[in-house]
Amino acid sequence: VLSYWDFVTQDAIDAIYQGEFPGWAVEHGGVLETSLMLHLHPHLVEMEKVCDHAPAEFPPYDFFPIKPEWTPASGCLSSAKRASAEHGETLLKVCVDGISHELATAFD
């Protein structure tokens, strides 16, 4: 099973986030995934509706049931306000290169 995030390099994270990466735990629907959508399917993204808030904070362990106050009212765990098609293009290239390399290595 391949997941795109397994192939995102630290250099790509640094270039996209400029040292402000909130972490993978709160990235779902954040800058990276929204940037990919802006690059691949911009007509499906309504950036004017993106909330701008601090990333959600969770304890470093699983807790059930999850406390509703841990999730921002928007339902988004981090803001996608800094997303761009350019970031999406960078991310797609890094992931395609990484996945292609691994598949070529595995099936060579």
Task: Give the location of each predicted region.
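Extended, histidine- and acidic-residue-enriched regions that form the cofactor-binding/catalytic faces
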Residues: 1-108
